[in-house]
Amino acid sequence: MAVPVSQLLRQHSTNPVQYTGLTTNTDKKWAKEFHPITRLIGHTTLGADGETVYANFDAMAPPLADDDFRVAKHAFPPNERRWRLETEEDCGVWFHTEVSNIVLPAWNDRPAVLQTCQSKPASTTKSIKENVDMIYALADSHLQKRPLVIGEWKRNIIRSKAWLAGNIGTAGTQVNLSRELRGYAVKYSCPHVFCFDGQYLLLLQFRAATKEDLKRQDCEVDCWVIPRINTAEGCTLRYAFYRFLAQGFRRCQGLSGGRTPVNGFAPHSREWFSGIPIFQDEHGVLTYTHPQNTDEHAFYRELNVEDGSFYWCYNGDYLLDLNGALVRDTEPMWGFPEA
């Protein structure tokens, strides 16, 4: 029976799994040109019971009105079946069936998200030899099919304690993995990268202020490590993956914006990994808030669920231009005319 996606996101997979524990290392030659990840910020914690893994998503955008629309859609739980996770392909099929296929009904429209395998980046003209395993991208041609998130399948490779401690060492498999994931982020111009190895889902958000910052060794990286096996109170893979897709969408949503003046102040730039507008005050200081905001008066953004754009408000009212139209911060993300 179909149930709201919100209900399925809170449920762990219940199909039995035989996990072999076989390992695949990674040591790709092309990845050696990229710096390992050295500045990790962990956002998952182990509970007092020593078993429950909790996740804090404050480093991502909070759920908004369009999220309510998505998770209210109905979807079906996976069919009952048995699993044996032995190869990377087994891990990928499990993830598609038990996680991705549950999450994607929420993203069938507003906006439409397309999942593809082993494909080149569609939003760039550069030629690359390497293919990432998974791309989740905006499907509408109006949006240049920008990638929301990209991902890799591995096999029993992620050492969760090292990643959560923010210290994956200076050599070995974890360092090689970090080089590879940074490399894919650079090649696909996507700061949101995940890796699933059959046991853990590793989510990485490169906090790159500009696209070029992806390459920098001092670029901070938000990190979540969610286990496949968790207690009922712990974070589910489905919920974590939904939030990750939503964060990738907020980035694409924000980067569609321009420099429309807001009461005389136009955004100075956009934070690349989040899409948030950055202002510059009269002293040259960069700030996330409008330079004229005070404790009593504030300019802020609201989401238009009809077309997916952000528009500006002032003290609870719509901010209008001289023609009486909404002052928009970003472009529409759905509701385009049929081709």
Segments predicted by a language model, with ranges:
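Eukaryote-biased feature marking scaffold/signaling PDZ-domain proteins and nuclear chromatin regulators
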Residues: 129-131, 144-151, 172, 176-179, ...
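Charged, often low-complexity linker/regulatory segments
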Residues: 1-123, 247-339
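Short amphipathic alpha-helical interaction elements and helix-loop-helix interfaces
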Residues: 105, 109, 113, 140-143, ...
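Conserved catalytic cores of phosphodiester-cleaving nucleases, focusing on short active-site segments
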Residues: 95, 99-103, 134-136, 145-164
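Nucleic-acid nuclease catalytic cores
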Residues: 169-217
